[in-house]
Amino acid sequence: MVEPFEIPTEWIKFRAMDWGQAKPYACLWFAVDYDGNLYCYRELYGWGGKANIGTGETAREVGEKICKLEKRSEKVQGGVLDNACWARTGVTAPTIEEELDAVLIKHKLIPFRKCSKGRIEGANAFKQRLIGNEMKDGSFKPAIYFFKTCYHSIRTIPMIGHDKHNPELPDTTAEDHCYDAVAYACSSRPFSPMRAKMKRDSYDCYRTEKKRSAWTY
């Protein structure tokens, strides 16, 4: 967790969303710094005041809430959304994605795109960022951070365990909506851990002995 700060205008910003009606929905906003680290700086969590209980809001109602939080001047470069939102439940009824994006487009915001990765890939992408990059002292520095104002992300993500039947996956019976949104975000921004670069002594091309410095005698 980090204290909120003013995000530089040059950083890339995007959103990631896990849809829910009977259960909560989670829309999270992320910024990408110059080193590729992710900062979750805002959340919109649709819960009914009790753990894992949704609000029953329609996709259009939720879309309007997203637009109230996200301004055009913020220059959010679209977002990733749960694949299931593209499923059509009736012959003529619009999909969740169509309803959400219709509102975003009306407000001149960039719509969502489909998250193309599966749950295992998303879980691994999140795990890699939690481990992060190796430092010179052998420790590791995470590549993802959460503003302290992201209450529900901080409340729910640490409580999620492993699936009883597949330890590669999170427990889907838990309140995993913020977790899923983070997994979509991590999948959309591939991360390659960097090993610490240790300072090396300079060597001559033809000799194994150290080069003599101009300041040594």
Task: Please report, for each region that a protein language model flagged, where it lies by residue.
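Short beta-strand scaffold segments in enzyme catalytic cores
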Residues: 25-31
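Acidic, Mg2+-coordinating catalytic module of metal-dependent nucleases/exonucleases
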Residues: 169-198
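Mg2+-dependent endonuclease catalytic cores in nucleic-acid-processing enzymes, primarily RNase H-like
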Residues: 34-171, 190-193, 204-205, 213-217
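Accessory terminal regions of nucleic-acid processing enzymes
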Residues: 2-3, 187, 208-212
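Short, flexible loop/turn elements at secondary-structure junctions
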Residues: 19-21, 83
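Residue-level detector of short, conserved catalytic/binding motifs and their immediate flanks
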Residues: 13, 25, 77, 179
